[in-house]
């Protein structure tokens, strides 16, 4: 997993709290909690915020790539939580990434969010995506943050540059409405499929999930009932579930690229229904706190 990392600062009427975060970092944690061996390339400092990030990575059994802890300062993201649990963000960051060596055992490389569209790190991300495509499935979640992007038109160019390099793309309806104001979600998804991915998945909050493949499959999945505490990390947990589900279905890895493109409706529906459950568990508790297999009532993997 290729990631920016941050200390998330949560502000409500209650006292301010700090937790480790960053979208692909959350995905890595979610995958690890689902029993997958996960490696993270990121950037943070040996400071108070960085130690929070390191402890979180190590406590979840994630392998940290060398040089990930050599930043001058650790980025922070301040999440302001509304009464309905929706989060808005303010960021304080400057960052780059260490070089990632992709081993022959790598099955999937995931990246997204700030890492993929903020200079200078975005150039490293694109390089990793290009190199990874030769031996692994490449997945991407733009996780749009309008406060850090100039305007939809320039943001589309940056994000579609990564979309074209990916096999699987996940985005929220809010992402797409900001990037393509006034356009239909399915129309946007088909445009992205034309750029190269085999699968595009769109999360729509309480309205459910849309999924389209470049072979013409189109699915709508209902959301899973949940009592929302806050929405922080919900999309990242969903992404972890999507990767885990595709992994279990033997649809990840360069040797399975054709199988991924030809995924059948029943398999994709099963995977996305479980993803909805994973997202529902995450929004039912505070912070980016993805579920374990035990939370899902599933047996641990050997």
Please report, for each region that a protein language model flagged, where it lies by residue.
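Histidine-anchored nucleotide/phosphate-binding helix
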Residues: 24-33, 128-130
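Alpha-helix C-terminal capping segments
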Residues: 19, 28-37, 245-247
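Conserved beta-alpha-beta core of the PfkB/ribokinase-like small-molecule kinase fold
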Residues: 108-190, 197, 206-208
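Conserved N-terminal subdomain of the carbohydrate kinase-like
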Residues: 36-116, 134, 138, 300-302
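A short, glycine/small-residue-rich beta-strand->loop->alpha-helix junction that serves as a flexible
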Residues: 14-23
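Conserved phosphate-binding/catalytic region of the ribokinase-like
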Residues: 181-302
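Single conserved hydrophobic/aromatic residue that forms the stacking wall/gate
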Residues: 1-6, 10
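Structural alpha-helical scaffold elements that stabilize or flank donor/cofactor-binding regions
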Residues: 2, 101-102, 161-162
């Amino acid at each position: 997993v290729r990631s920016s990392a941050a200390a998330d600062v949560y502000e409500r009427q209650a006292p301010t709290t700090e937790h480790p975060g960053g979208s692909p970092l959350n995905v890595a944690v979610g995958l690890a909690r689902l029993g997958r061996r996960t490696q993270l390339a990121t950037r943070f400092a040996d400071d108070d915020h960085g130690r929070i990030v390191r402890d979180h990575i190590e406590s979840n059994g994630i392998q940290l790539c060398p040089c990930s802890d050599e930043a001058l300062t650790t980025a922070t993201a301040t999440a302001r939580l509304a009464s309905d649990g929706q989060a808005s963000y303010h960021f304080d960051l400057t960052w780059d990434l260490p070089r990632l060596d992709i081993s022959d055992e790598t099955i999937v490389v995931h990246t997204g969010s700030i890492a993929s569209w903020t200079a200078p790190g975005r150039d490293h991300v694109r390089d990793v995506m290009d190199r990874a495509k030769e031996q692994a499935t490449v997945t991407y979640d733009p996780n749009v943050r309008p406060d850090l992007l100039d305007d939809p038109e320039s943001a589309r160019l940056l994000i579609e540059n990564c979309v074209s390099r990916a096999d699987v793309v996940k985005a929220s309806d809010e992402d797409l409405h900001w990037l393509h104001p006034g356009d239909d979600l399915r129309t946007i998804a088909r445009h992205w499929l034309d750029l190269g991915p085999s699968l595009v998945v769109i999360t729509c909050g309480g309205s459910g999930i849309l999924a389209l493949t470049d072979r013409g499959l189109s699915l709508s999945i209902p959301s899973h009932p949940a009592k929302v505490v806050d929405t922080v990390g919900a999309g990242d947990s969903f992404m972890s579930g999507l990767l885990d589900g595709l992994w279990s279905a033997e649809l990840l890895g360069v040797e399975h690229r054709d199988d991924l493109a030809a995924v059948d409706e029943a398999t994709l529906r099963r995977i996305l229904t479980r993803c909805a459950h994973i997202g529902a568990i995450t929004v039912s508790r505070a912070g980016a706190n993805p579920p374990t297999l035990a939370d899902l009532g599933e047996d641990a993997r050997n």
